[in-house]
Amino acid sequence: MLSPKRTKFRKPHRGRFRGTATRGNKIVFGEYALQALEPVWLTSRQIEATRRSVTRFVKRTGKLWIRVFPDKSISCKPPETRMGAGKGAPDYWVAVIKPGHILFEIGGVSETLAYNAFKNASYKLPIKTKFISKEFQ
């Protein structure tokens, strides 16, 4: 699972989603990409499951770039705990995704293989996604 080695603060505020992605919304590394169409907190487990799905589908040919990183900790209180007594301990890590953000890029494979790999991988994600290519960007 992806997680930061160290952070400035252990327990960040929850925040909220406003607007669309102004950064990370262009294809930089590969030829084809998977783009988010909805706002979401992507967990490190979801990112890893999607990565494994794509690499297995393309049979480890080409190159895959992960364009998101889970750098926000989500805290959780233990079950059957009374309210109060401070904020819970960090439980898992998420990446904050806005609409239009590029999640994954792939290169060195055909367009049909990349499309099918990303279509298969999108079932691992809790949001609607779109397949885009560099030539039509």
UniProtKB/Swiss-Prot annotation:
Disulfide bridge map: none
Record GO biological process: mitochondrial translation
A GO term for molecular function: rRNA binding
Keyword Ubl conjugation tagged: no
InterPro entries: Ribosomal_uL16, Ribosomal_uL16_bact-type, Ribosomal_uL16_CS, Ribosomal_uL16_dom, Ribosomal_uL16_sf
Keywords: Chloroplast, Plastid, Ribonucleoprotein, Ribosomal protein
Main location: plastid
Pfam family, one: Ribosomal_L16
Subunit structure: Part of the 50S ribosomal subunit.
Family: Belongs to the universal ribosomal protein uL16 family.
Entry-linked PANTHER family: 50S/60S RIBOSOMAL PROTEIN L16, LARGE RIBOSOMAL SUBUNIT PROTEIN UL16M
The protein's name: Large ribosomal subunit protein uL16c
